[in-house]
Amino acid sequence: EPDSSDGVITVSSLSKTGGVPRYHGALDITKDSSGYMVVNQVNIEQYLYGVVSSEVSSSYSMEALKAQAICARGFTYRKLGCNYRGYDADLDDTTACQVYNNFPETDSSITAVDETAGVVPTYNGEIINAVYFSTSCGTTTTSDQVWGGSMPYTCTRIQNTALDIPYFSNETAFQDFMDGKTDTDVVERNLPMYTWTVSYTDSEM
């Protein structure tokens, strides 16, 4: 644990995409048959500094970073105590939960968290399950189409400012959209994960 509340711990044996990670709070290190397990005990707001910087680029607008901070905070509160009790932890630092400390916190990620401190997304007074994705395929969808079960605050929405829907009434038009040949300006259309393929059997259809 650092000597001061704003101190950090560097773990030189770890390597993340953004370099050697540094951690606020304290580290609990235990050894088991497979190696060492490291659990970072940190307050949620400082944890979010490293989530926002790792989940979205700090070059994004401040309002986008604030939106990410609010979603990530809601996701965190919803997951506390759910899945990792066997490790004396609440979350892991990968896409299984939220990516944490893969890139160092930045002035922008700190500002986004600080300026939304304590704000969470709610529906009917309850914190929502604020799931989000790293790469948009041009539209969102409802929860029942992904996991089953209804979350009424999720909806299908085209991810562009005009909220217009491309012409999908025939196979050629749909294929042109999937191949990026249309003029529809949707978020992240030029990224590799913008389109993907899934297969269903006749019975599943």
Regions found by a protein language model. Name each.
Residues E1-M205:
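Conserved, single-site charged/polar hotspot
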